[in-house]
Amino acid sequence: MRLTLISLSTPTFNNCRAASALPYHLISSVKKSFSASVDVYSYNINELDTNQIEQVEKELNITIHLLDKPKWLKLMMMLHLVFLRVFLKYPLYSYCSLPQKHIDAIKSTHSDVIWIYGEELANHSKYFEGSKCIVTMPDCESLYYYRMLRQPWATMRLLQILKYAFAYWQYKSLERLFCEKDVIYHFVGKEDADFFKLMNGQANSLFMRHPLYAYNSEKTIKFHQPKIKLLFTGRYDFYCQHGSDDFLSELEKNRNGLSSYFEITFLGKGWEKWNEKLHKVGFQSQHISFAPDYIAELQNHDIQVNAIDVGTGTKGKVLDGIANGLLIIGTPYALENISVKNGDSCVMVSNGIEFIQSLYV
């Protein structure tokens, strides 16, 4: 079997400055299941250096060819002029072209499958008519902005509404441009696949759950004593800021009843203020902005909290927690597309009050 992957990012074991882990582990699975030869053509937007690229080639036994981004795009990034994308009809990276010499090289291999990773590159399938093409999106970006426009807290200002409406229009325009009935569009989100199909009736959309990868199958599930270790993971950013503020405000209010039973850790950037707040009101709290071995640090805790307000697809940090034996307390968006059951293998909550109630149970 011969497979050619065209990707925005260079595959890596864990996400590195992009959603680069999914293709890595899919390639690894293919290699274990078939006698497969894999060539990767990467725009390397996650900026791996030569040594890192060679290491990935060695780990997966693949060949990686680097592709150039347009010079104007590189200049725009270098001069921090990304805001100029508002003058473009399509999303920024969709302007990455595939030179004819690489098209010819790929065709000469007679690959069984042309695999494209990243929605912005989906239009590259046009170069390989007659070949079996699969595009791993992996999320539907237009659904993300559609969801944003439905959030009251995200649309309080006119500028916000215009920003999300414009991005929605960009991705919808791109989807109309590239969607072909003889190409398979692969998603790791059920609603992503359904929304894409709804908006593009001729689309052949496929939903497959995101694979687990970095996990410890031998971990003994047992809460720490005398204090249960509660973990907030991921960057404190727009995706989770509103929900996390709600959860943590309620936690702060209930300090008298909970500070004796829970130890709090924030693992990720941006949590400094909340760590200081909880520490001042009596919680045992610490902030780890970066862990050299993320999985090892994860396994030191009992419960993982993910208050994600909006998003699409599958949330990698949530998958990591489940795979490593932590009880996940999370919002519906945090837990979507993961094969778990509320009250059995996870606890699903919608707001800060429900979060606190789950800690008292």
Please annotate each region the language model reported:
Residues 1-63, 109, 252-257:
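N-terminal subdomain of nucleotide-sugar transferases
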Residues 3, 128-156:
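Active-site proximal beta-strand in glycosyltransferases
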Residues 22, 207-279, 289-294, 298-299:
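Conserved catalytic-core segment of nucleotide-activated headgroup transferases in glycan assembly
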Residues 28, 100-105, 141, 153-185:
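Membrane-proximal helix-turn-helix segments that form the acceptor-binding/catalytic region
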Residues 134-135, 164-218:
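Donor nucleotide-sugar binding/catalytic pocket of nucleotide-sugar-dependent glycosyltransferases
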Residues 299-313, 324-326:
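Acidic donor-binding loop of glycosyltransferase active sites
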Residues 317-320, 327-331:
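Short hydrophobic beta-strand element within catalytic cores of glycosyltransferases
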Residues 346-353, 360-361:
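Conserved acidic donor-binding segment of nucleotide-sugar-dependent glycosyltransferases
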